[in-house]
């Protein structure tokens, strides 16, 4: 009964009734046995299959992770080897370039030294030729000048002595 929104309980649902408790328990046990016979096996096997599937997925994930770590380790090793190889190639290239540069510089220096030596030798030869020409001209001028001064003819030995003396005087004055 309902009076002003409150339920009056006179031997209703909340009072314990031993017969109701007995039959409820018996019904529960019977339903439990039926469920155990019919549904428990499939439920347990489904749960076990699910557990096996999950465990299999976990195992595959661990295996994939281990394989990925192994591949990563190998890649790092390969990268380290490639870095070392590239460093070696760069170092060898630099050494080769340095040797090549040094060889070219050495060859250029040798070529320049050879050219300078040849130029000096050529200059020295030209200097000797010019001095020889100059000596001859000076000797001739000196002889002509001496002949005019003394108005007499000199013999060849005397001319040679006078010319040699003048050349030596000129050489000592120049140096």
Swiss-Prot record:
Keywords, ordered alphabetically: ATP synthesis, Cell inner membrane, Cell membrane, CF(0), Hydrogen ion transport, Ion transport, Membrane, Transmembrane, Transmembrane helix, Transport
A Pfam family: ATP-synt_B
Keyword Transmembrane helix appears in the UniProt entry: yes
InterPro entries the UniProt entry points to: ATP_synth_B-like_membr_sf, ATP_synth_b/b'su_bac/chlpt, ATP_synth_F0_bsu_bac, ATP_synthase_B_chain
Subunit details: F-type ATPases have 2 components, F(1) - the catalytic core - and F(0) - the membrane proton channel. F(1) has five subunits: alpha(3), beta(3), gamma(1), delta(1), epsilon(1). F(0) has four main subunits: a(1), b(2) and c(10-14). The alpha and beta chains form an alternating ring which encloses part of the gamma chain. F(1) is attached to F(0) by a central stalk formed by the gamma and epsilon chains, while a peripheral stalk is formed by the delta and b chains.
Protein role: F(1)F(0) ATP synthase produces ATP from ADP in the presence of a proton or sodium gradient. F-type ATPases consist of two structural domains, F(1) containing the extramembraneous catalytic core and F(0) containing the membrane proton channel, linked together by a central stalk and a peripheral stalk. During catalysis, ATP synthesis in the catalytic domain of F(1) is coupled via a rotary mechanism of the central stalk subunits to proton translocation.
Record's protein name: ATP synthase subunit b
Organism per entry: Chlorobium phaeobacteroides (strain DSM 266 / SMG 266 / 2430)
